[in-house]
Every structure is written in C-alpha cells, then in structure tokens.
C-alpha cells in the first residue's frame, strides 16, 4: 500500500522540518494552508518552495483547501472541534471540491510516476487538531493510501 504523509511545522525550525521530509523520502509537498505565510523563518511560500527545490522536493499550494479565517480564529482560541466543523462546511464549496479533486489527481500522479510520496503541510503539530487529517482521510477513502504523520522535534 502506498503512503501519504502529513506534517505540521509548529514549534519547529526549517532545518528540522526539511530533514524530516528528506528522511521520509517525500517527493511533493502540498501546502494546504489558506495563507501560505508564516512568522517562522523558512515557512512562507517563497522561502519554503526554494528550500524544497534545493532538496529535490516539489511544492504546490492549494489555498482553497485551507481553513477559512473563522476556523483559524476558532483554532487559535483552542476550539479545534469548532474549527473542524467550519472546515467541513468549507470543504463542500465548489472551490474546495475543485482543489480536492486536484489534490487527488496529484496523489494519483505521485503514485504512478514516482516511489516518492506526497506530503500535506499545515501549521498545527497535532494532526488530530488540524484539517489536514480530514484531507488525508479523504485521500485514503478515494485512493486507499496509508496515512502516516511526520513529526518534527520541537525546538
């Protein structure tokens, strides 16, 4: 069974993060943040894409698969369940469905063309408190991928 990875960069450095991806053999990182910017050095879209490129890892940003602002605010307030309910509603929108189909196609291509798996990226360290778990579950249901979560050592 082919694998799909997920990773969050909360409490990590770019170096530790890149090492985790390299050790797992990731070939494509799919950024599922609504806003691909970060106060953490190395995790904003351009810096992240450049760091991945240096390591031979592709980068795609699927903005519409990110959690809407009201969901991010709920998560920051410690209301992960509310964030997930908001994300479930958002996932039913045509824009999110289109990008979910695009994500599925990327995963299929990754499986067909490469032995290097795809990895979903968001901020939250714990996948149980992050919408990327829901997206990973969807890819498992659609393609039968085994979901594995990568964890960066906190610094």
What are these model-derived regions, one by one?
Residues 1-155:
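Residues lining hydrophobic/aromatic ligand-binding pockets adjacent to catalytic sites
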């Amino acid at each position: 069974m082919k694998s799909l990875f997920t990773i969050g960069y909360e409490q990590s450095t770019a170096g530790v993060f890149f090492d985790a991806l390299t050790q797992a053999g990731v070939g494509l990182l799919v950024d599922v943040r609504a806003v691909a910017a970060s106060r953490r050095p190395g995790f904003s879209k351009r810096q992240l894409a450049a760091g991945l490129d240096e390591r031979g890892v592709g980068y795609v940003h699927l903005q519409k698969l990110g959690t809407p602002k009201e969901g991010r605010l709920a998560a920051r307030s410690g209301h992960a369940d509310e964030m997930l309910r908001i994300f479930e509603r958002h996932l039913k929108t045509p824009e999110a469905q289109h990008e979910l189909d695009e994500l599925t196609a990327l995963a299929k291509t990754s499986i067909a063309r490469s032995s290097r798996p795809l990895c979903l990226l968001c901020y939250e360290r714990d996948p149980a408190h992050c919408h990327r778990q829901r997206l990973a579950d969807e890819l498992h249901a659609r393609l039968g991928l085994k979901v594995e979560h990568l964890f960066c050592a906190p610094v």
